[in-house]
UniProtKB/Swiss-Prot annotation:
It comes from Rattus norvegicus. The keyword Ribonucleoprotein does not apply. One of its GO terms (cellular component) is motile cilium. The keyword Acetylation does not apply. This is Calcium-binding and spermatid-specific protein 1. InterPro entries: Ca-bd_spermatid (IPR026118).
Length: 390
């Protein structure tokens, strides 16, 4: 019973006598339309009253204000405050982490991101991925300051760490040196949370880039060294007979060299073993007689193509008068002996006009006497003429 004698009236049967209707019923209008029952029976007595007599249509909050006395209002206010506190306490528990997340979670974010950056900088490729710090631009300035150090000369770890600390101190306090007093700042937390080893890691990340160029230079320099050792030069063996002077000016130092694809066979070893044996008309087969058939064996020796192997490289030593014989090679294969005689005469004329050529030919003839034009052809076939033609 209330103080004025009026019974308590509830819109629905009470769950507990001590509890009041919930907040949603009062403030949020969950039960704006009250179920209009004819009678309600209270728990305090057998009084039967009509709800329509004392309850007006409208919000339940107005009816509560009309029906509840002062003690009930006090209980309601206390319960509402308690319920509001119970609802606001998780909000405070949520807001206090959000207030702390403004400092500590950001610190944890920077603690998580900065090792990622150092890992990206320490990659051998040298690519740096910047993470977008939209909340604080000072972090990008710190990262750019560390990246700009890449363009400068690479210094030792101690010097680079000192220069980074000096540049960060001069940068309008954008990067604060690690202090324990400045843990609240997000920008200071980035610098305070990062240990001093971060500078060492950054310098270690830049040091491979300084090591990369000498390694690449070594790779580049080895290629021209291999080419320079070979000394590959190209000449045309076919020279017109009208201009023999261009060929006869060759000397020992001017002998043209170029690499051949084939390998030297046993005939070259025979040439080295027997350098003084002249090549006569009886040794080669009939098909090769067109190349060798001349008045004197000295002419065949002097006008031969010499194949020499110097330091495991195969060289053609092209003498002065041999180039004229190369020009005459094609008609000699199928024609008669008349062009051979003309070629021999032209060769002898050249040797008589330029006696220096004979000295060159004699010096080269001392190396290999048996390696003539026919032997050169069979060396290309990697077979000896005796095995084929005899």
């Amino acid at each position: 019973m209330a103080e004025d004698g009026s019974p308590k009236i509830y819109s629905r049967p009470p769950r507990d006598s001590s509890k009041t209707p919930t907040e949603a019923d009062i403030f949020f209008g969950a039960d704006n339309t009250i179920p209009k029952s004819e009678t309600t029976i209270t728990s305090e007595g057998d009084h039967i009253t009509s709800v329509n007599d004392c309850t007006a249509d409208g919000d339940f909050s107005t009816t509560v204000n009309k029906l509840t006395p002062t003690k009930e209002k006090l209980k309601l206010e206390e319960d509402i405050e308690a319920s509001l506190k119970s609802t606001t306490l998780p909000e405070k528990e949520i807001t206090t982490p959000t207030e702390t997340t403004n400092s500590k979670p950001k610190e944890s974010i920077t603690e998580n991101f900065i090792p990622v950056k150092i890992g990206n900088i320490s990659s051998p490729v040298g690519t740096v991925s910047l993470i977008d710090f939209s909340s604080n631009m000072a972090k990008e300035d710190i990262l750019l300051a560390t990246i700009d150090a890449e363009d400068k000369e690479v210094k030792p770890t101690t010097e680079l760490s000192e220069t980074q600390e000096d540049s960060s101190a001069n940068d309008e306090d954008t990067s604060v040196p690690p202090d324990e007093n400045t843990e609240t700042d997000v920008s200071s937390s980035t610098s305070s949370d990062v240990p001093d080893d971060g500078a060492v890691q950054v310098t270690d990340s830049f040091s491979p880039e300084s090591d990369v160029p000498p390694s690449t230079e070594k790779e580049v320099t080895t290629i021209p060294d291999n080419v320079a050792e070979d000394k590959v030069t190209k000449i045309d063996l076919i020279v017109s007979e009208d201009r023999p002077k261009t060929v006869t000016k060759l000397s020992d130092s001017e002998e043209e060299k170029f690499i051949t694809v084939f390998e030297l066979t046993n005939s070259a070893e025979k040439a080295k073993d027997n350098p003084e044996d002249p090549l006569t008309d009886e040794e080669p087969a009939d098909g090769v007689n067109t190349w060798v058939e001349k008045d004197a064996a000295n002419e065949a020796e002097s006008h031969a193509v010499l194949l020499t192997a110097v330091e495991s490289r195969y060289d053609f030593v092209v003498t002065a008068s041999e180039t004229n014989s190369v020009v005459v090679e094609e008609p000699h294969v199928d024609t008669k002996n008349s062009p051979e005689k003309d070629a021999a005469e032209s060769v002898t004329n050249v040797t008589e006009e330029f006696p220096s050529v004979t000295s060159v030919v004699e010096q080269s003839g001392n190396k290999e006497d048996l390696s003539t034009n026919d032997s050169g052809i069979f060396k290309l076939l990697k077979e000896e003429p005796d095995e084929l033609m005899m």
